[in-house]
Amino acid sequence: AAPIWQDFSFTGLYGENYAHPVNMDDNNQQTTATVEYTAKLKYGDFFGFADRAHNDFENSTYFELSPRLSLSAVTGTKLEAGPIKDILIAGTWEANSSNYPGADFNNYLYGIGFDLAIPYFQYAQLNFYKADNEKGTTDDYQMTAAYGIPVKLGSEDFLIDGFLDWSTGENATHASELNWTTQWKWNVGKHISPDTRLYVGVEHSVWNNKYAIKGLDQNDVSALIKY
């Protein structure tokens, strides 16, 4: 069946404060090209993206594919309570390919998700996962929140959207991670035509214990263009 709606986008990013395990510092330059696809389906939704990144130490391709199955749609019963709009079975496949030794992996996450109704939010999701990580990497648990907030100032349209990932620390070599990434974007495309979405802005990334490495912390602001 055709999607109820779908969206495809391309994003370019450039920042100078990316953290990397080679030097355990966050003063590394990185350029990233991202393609994203999201769709609302009859029985759930789908989100996927791929990053092609180049920094001082490596070239890498990272992607995530995240299908979710709506229990409301499957059962024909609205599963709503308070701010919860729907309950979903959630899954994610994370994969990385890099010329940096030991950086390739495939992780498989599965769990339960919630769609939330929050005033002023275009969308809000909360997912809880068990992560089966690459062999040699400790399995853990993860919480992922995703959100989008449209803002209108005068005749100008802005969008604040992003995600927050928090994962558990399992042992001395696998620290608890927190990755909070938000994009602050202005739609300059509406000045080209009413239906054109061309965003410029910044992406702010706060990533504590990046890659589950204790003390590898990132606080980066990247220039952004998205179409």
Language-model regions, residue ranges each:
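Transmembrane beta-barrel domains of outer membrane proteins
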Residues: 38-40, 68-70, 113-117, 146-150, ...
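Surface-exposed loop and membrane-interface regions of Gram-negative outer-membrane beta-barrel proteins
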Residues: 48-102, 177
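Short loop/turn motifs that connect adjacent beta-strands in outer-membrane beta-barrel proteins
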Residues: 2-6, 43-47, 71-88, 117-124, ...
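Transmembrane beta-strands of outer-membrane beta-barrel pores
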Residues: 12-18, 52-56, 91-99, 128-134, ...
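Short glycine/proline- and aromatic-enriched beta-strand/turn motifs that initiate or cap beta-hairpins
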Residues: 2-53
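Outer-membrane beta-barrel transmembrane domain signature
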Residues: 127-197, 206-208
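Transmembrane beta-barrel outer-membrane domains
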Residues: 26-30, 58-62, 82-84, 103-107, ...
